[in-house]
Structure formats: structure tokens, C-alpha cells
A protein has these predicted regions:
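N-terminal active-site beta-alpha-beta segment that forms phosphate/nucleotide-binding
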Residues: 49-166
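Positively charged, low-complexity intrinsically disordered leader regions
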Residues: 1-39, 43-46
């Protein structure tokens, strides 16, 4: 298996769960978790099954979009209240993860800015924003790798600190 073929966090094709690479098992075992409940995603973030600030942010953004898609609210006020409840809960999963809070705030801002839309369209906007957050991080990671490659020479070693990138 090529490491470049692995995604740390993906939304399933039918958009009913997150597919998360369980990083606690690496490098010996590659296992993808399929998590649909907010509590299970919270636990995956809390227990470092998802590692690296950017990946945690992407995971939280998709989790919020998933949870919002299940809201039965019929008006924007109730929908935003449901979203805020899920956001506040997810924020407790890793109190030091900056990207977690940044992504959750960005998702809530997207909902507030689009609150005039019909609820089904608002839900779609949240999925689109979560996807945008993921794609931005993938592009940043690729750019870092491309630029960094030009700085390395045969025999150089690399020491990493923490995990980064989706």
C-alpha cells in the first residue's frame, strides 16, 4: 500500500459517516474506522485516533456537518442552536487543539452567514465548507512537501514534532 493513497479523514461517499485512519495502530496496522455518531467521533479525537492539528480540524468540521445534516430543526434559530450544541461538545474533545476550535468556528460562521437559506440548502453549505477545509489542508501539506523536498539532500535525516496535515 502506498502511503500517499491513505487519507486520515474522509467523509463516506453516502455522507453518513466519517472514515478515519486509526493512527494509534500505525505503523504496524492500517485500520479505517467508520464513525457515524458524534460521541464516537469525539472519542476518536480525544483518544488520538485522529492526530495532528489539521486532521483534527478537518475531522471536527465533517463531524459538525454530519450532525447538522441530522438536525430536525425547521427554522434557522433552532438549527443554529442544534449546531452550537454539537460544536460546544466537540470543542471539549481536545482542549489544546487550535485547529479544532478554528474549524468549528469557521463552520458555525458559515451557518450563521447562510441562515436565511432553506435548512436543506444550509446543510449542503456546511458539507461544502467542511470539504473546503479538508481540500485547503491537503493543498497546504502538498506544498510543504514539495518545497521541503528541494531542501533535502541524500543522507539527510528528518525529525518531526507532532503530526500534521490531513
Amino acid at each position: 500500500m502506498n502511503a500517499l493513497d491513505l487519507d486520515t479523514v474522509l467523509l463516506s461517499q453516502d455522507r453518513d459517516c466519517l472514515e478515519i485512519l486509526d493512527q494509534t495502530l500505525l505503523p504496524g496496522t492500517v485500520r479505517v474506522l467508520h464513525l457515524s455518531k458524534l460521541e464516537d467521533i469525539w472519542e476518536a479525537i480525544r483518544t488520538l485516533r485522529v492526530r495532528g492539528a489539521p486532521a483534527i480540524g478537518v475531522c471536527a468540521a465533517y463531524a459538525l456537518a454530519l450532525e447538522a445534516s441530522r438536525s430536525r430543526a425547521e427554522d434557522a434559530e433552532c438549527f443554529l442552536r442544534d449546531l452550537r450544541t454539537a460544536k460546544d461538545y466537540l470543542a471539549t474533545s481536545r482542549p489544546t487543539a487550535v485547529n479544532l476550535f478554528w474549524a468549528l468556528e469557521r463552520m458555525e460562521r458559515t451557518a450563521r452567514e447562510n441562515a436565511r437559506l432553506p435548512i436543506p440548502e444550509l446543510k449542503e453549505r456546511l458539507f461544502a465548507e467542511a470539504h473546503r477545509i479538508r481540500e485547503e489542508d491537503v493543498q497546504i501539506s502538498r506544498n510543504i512537501g514539495r518545497i521541503g523536498l528541494g531542501l533535502l539532500h541524500h543522507g539527510d535525516g528528518i525529525l518531526t514534532h507532532c503530526n500534521a496535515g490531513t
